[in-house]
């Protein structure tokens, strides 16, 4: 559900809000883990979208690694295990790291708290 729409809400605002909602859901899921992740990697089609990668970094308040040649990751991971070279992935694969922007992360932290309070109410709507 979209909350807070007004006549000035543009299509781009709604698209961004959809991405933010997914990012908030990912954060909610990650908060259920027993331990915080040390690394977060993103692969697939969404990893090609800079805005999505940055939204994730800001919402999760954690760097996001994006590997340019993700298709070889399984083979590199296997070789890393077989040859006992733990840092092989970092030395073989080109990686872009999206760092959280502290100001944006604070804004998203406030929005995430609102998301957590609204989500239970909206979830019951049919």
Where do the protein language model's features map onto the residues?
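Glycine/Thr-rich phosphate-binding loops that ligate phosphate moieties of nucleotide
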Residues: 1-126
């Amino acid at each position: 559900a979209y909350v807070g729409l007004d006549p000035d809400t543009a299509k781009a605002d709604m698209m961004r809000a959809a991405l933010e909602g997914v990012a908030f859901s990912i954060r909610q899921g990650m908060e259920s883990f027993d331990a915080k992740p040390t690394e977060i990697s993103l692969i697939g089609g969404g990893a090609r979208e800079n805005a999505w990668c940055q939204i994730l970094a800001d919402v999760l308040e954690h760097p996001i690694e994006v590997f340019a040649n993700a298709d070889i990751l399984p083979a590199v991971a296997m070789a890393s295990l077989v040859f006992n070279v733990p840092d092989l992935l970092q030395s073989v694969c080109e990686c872009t790291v999206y760092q959280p922007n502290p100001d944006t992360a604070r804004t998203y932290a406030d929005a995430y708290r609102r998301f957590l309070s609204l989500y239970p109410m909206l979830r019951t709507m049919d």
